[in-house]
Amino acid sequence: MQDAFSRMELLVGNTGVKKLSRAKIAVFGLGGAGSQVAESLARCGVGSLTLIDHEKITLTNIGSQVLALHSTLGMSKVEAAKKRIRDIDENILVHTYETFYNEETAGMFELRSFDYIVDTMGTLSSKLLLISRAREGRVPVISCLDIGDKIDPSRLEVADISRTTACPAARIIKKELRKQGIRKLKVLYSREQPAKEKLFRRRRTMVKKPAKGNISFVTGTAGYLLAGEVVRDILSAGNVSHS
């Protein structure tokens, strides 16, 4: 008898489907990559998703974020994601936190309750805190590094942070993690050289760029790659839902 995940079962088997259905995954950050991760995991039959983001959907999100539609403008990202995900799989458990992850809010989350953590947050201090807490709890974590100002999705790569190249964010994070004795971390990053041009032309005048640029096929590809890593790691691991 067919169900929503019958085609996936042909690929991963009944045991794989059961592993995913028991998995509890947290996604911190629902921007372009994070929102795609959450949706992709839902389409893989993951049993429980916890979504954390403090932002609301704006018009500028439409170009790069799967949650952003004219009908969702002004909605919190976590609520838009929950509604969309429950429309994909009505049986999935979705927990949402409309909050900014930092020292003040970190206590809200018992990280040991998760089988896997995905970090797609843009704030360096939040990333470092989450990575550190996840390591303390011995919870697998994958971190998406800076993919802004990139236009070539074929240059995206998953690697240990020690093997990254052409990524200024990786150098900073490596340095900070070493201070905590952390030398290994699975990350997604781009091998594309960062843009050197800090100015862009607007009405015949060179002005400083107000923010980093992004584009749908880079953020979307990043999300798919992250989700793929999570799913493959869960399938290759032992029992999940240890809590």
Model segments located where?
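Glycine-rich phosphate/adenylate-binding loop
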Residues: 21, 109-116, 121-126, 136, ...
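N-terminal charged helix/coil linker that caps or initiates catalytic domains
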Residues: 1-25
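Hydrophobic/small residue at the entry helix of a nucleotide-binding pocket
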Residues: 33
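Conserved S-adenosyl-L-methionine
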Residues: 43-48, 136
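Glycine-rich phosphate-binding loop and adjoining beta1-alpha1-beta2 segment
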Residues: 51-88
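Conserved N-terminal Rossmann-fold NAD(P)-binding element of oxidoreductases
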Residues: 27-29, 52
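Conserved SAM/SAH-binding loop
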Residues: 98-106
